[in-house]
Amino acid sequence: MIETRSDEQKYAFLRTEESREKNRYGDNIELAEEGNALREVSLNINGDTGISENPDRYKQHGFYLNADNCIGCHACEAACSEKNDNPAHISFRSVGYVEGGTYPDYQRLNISMACNHCDDPVCLKGCPTRAYTKFAEYGAVLQDPDICFGCGYCTWVCPYNAPQLDPVKGEVSKCNMCVDRLEVGLKPSCVSACLGNALDFGVIENVPENREQAQAEIPGFPTTDITHPNIRFQQTRQNKREMTRTDSMPLKYHKDEEVGKYKPVVDEKHGVKKQWNWKALLMTHESSHVIFTLSTQAILGAFLIIVLGSFTGVEAIVAIQSSVAYLPLLVLMNVLLMFGFYKLNMHLGKPHRFYRGFYNLRHSPVSREIAGVSLFFSSLLGFSVFSYFEIKPLIGLFAIMGVLSGPVGLFYMYKLYRIKARPFWDHWQTASSFVGTCLSLGSLTIVFVALIADALNTTQYISLVVLLLLGLLLEAIGHVAHAADLKNSEGEGSASWYLQTTRFAWPYIISNVLLGSSIIVSCLLLDSPSSTLGWLILGLSLLSTAVIRRSLFFALVIPTTMPGAFFWKNKAFEEHAKETGLANMPQVGVRYEEHRTFKVGELIDTIKTTTAKEAIDQLKEIFYWKKVK
């Protein structure tokens, strides 16, 4: 363990005092009772097998912020980054602020925030690689960047923006509670460095000396209902009724006089002018998700239509299966799904570690989605191969596998976006959009090949038109309901609606027009279902609205997160720095995302150095959901 300095100040040491049994959420503060197997186990920090004798070692600890004392000097940030050797663009602890009033009656409230080591860490449950662990020691939630493959899902689900995705290394890292310092009785580095005596640390719910409050909320802090964070606040000064953010997030905090708490509301700081912003919409990191979700849903829809249509004797499907178009259709489906997988994998920070996506089947919807869609892809591939050789028993086997695994993958694709920390996604419209896309793009895929091969007669197209129309109507109903709910909501959801009608207003309007046009053309095709021109218009309209709407799905989401500052943690400044070249200067704290490479050599080395026993033990941990010794 590290050695304490002989001149270490008294304020840098942890206090030992009586604590409560339960915290304010009803969770136990003592995380491992006497006799528990988790006790008296070394954390093996840097290979050190020592075990601390701290009597509070197995109690939940947390940070304490006295906002009255925080002067916004950023000493806590500097100390944290120095200790963890972080580059300028990564900071485990950040100081943001909200402000209210006007000069001379102006007020600024600084908020210093790192990981809150929550009682119910959603990052741990969401991470598909099991890179997160909540320890009985101090209740620390620790993350291993070496295990992380850089999907960034933990950064989506965390309400406090604690996990930091490094665009250079392609991995996530975060606050580790300075457990090496805790083991020798010292408080975390950020606390020891605080100039204003604003930060403190100790057993949760224990109020530090010379403090009056231990609140769980403060203006700008997201709701505690999601994760039960282990941080407490004091702020005795009276705030203004309205506190605003200086970053680009279109949010401010308005005090509800009835309950005495602040709630986020829309701040129309960017005006109400309708804008285009095509580049910001279509050329983003999330474009890979757009391609993957659309291609997967289209191919799943086409597969289910083929298999279930064949089973029920739908004339159009039977005709296609007996035509020359059938095998090319299956080849096209495999190619499109493979391309979607490729784009998804290459957006990872470490694409050669793709196999780690299966590690957290117990908790993570991402792992379950990957498992379901991967099994569906295998089923589609087997179905296609044995359809070529006309081996009916195996065709039937892979058809059943695909019909079962595909919807499971789609369900968890939907579940992984139902994130409480991202209200724009947390709506049933996400499901209606995904299912609607399956029906519409799935039908369109089949019709596209059938038209080229002239595989169907006029009346046989009608069943596919009906399915396509049902998909479009389902999407339209979902979008109308979603828009109505957003307009009537508060907070981040209504802020997303504000962006949808301002920054991305014209793409949103165009997508609505295209969706309506697609529905009208589909209705017209019921009268002339074999019209090549009609299908061409419908295809272009449908594909355009699908791409625009799915891109909006990712561009409009606003997470619940802590306020930033004018430069630091300000998305608008980050975009400006990248556009102007400021991001080339390391001291600016903004970096371009580096191109990802599939490091075949590292993957081969891993395969060579992993013994059969280690591989089997890893599989047991995945499927038996318990540690294998």
Residue spans for each PLM region:
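Non-ligating segments of multi-cofactor redox enzymes
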Residues: 1-294, 302-311, 316, 335, ...
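Long, hydrophobic/aromatic-enriched structural stretches that serve as scaffold segments
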Residues: 29, 47, 310, 329-391
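Membrane-entry segments of alpha-helical transmembrane domains in multi-pass membrane proteins
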Residues: 56-68, 280-301, 318-342, 360-374, ...
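Hydrophobic, membrane-facing alpha-helical anchors
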Residues: 271-283, 328-329, 346-358, 408-418, ...
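Long, contiguous internal "core" modules enriched in hydrophobic/ aromatic residues
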Residues: 286-287, 291-298, 314-321, 363-364, ...
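Juxtamembrane/interfacial segments flanking transmembrane helices
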Residues: 348-356, 417-421, 487-488, 554-561
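Cytosolic/matrix-facing juxtamembrane and C-terminal tails of multi-pass cellular membrane proteins
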Residues: 484-504, 557-604
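Primarily interfacial, aromatic-capped hydrophobic alpha-helices that serve as membrane anchors
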Residues: 517-524, 579-629
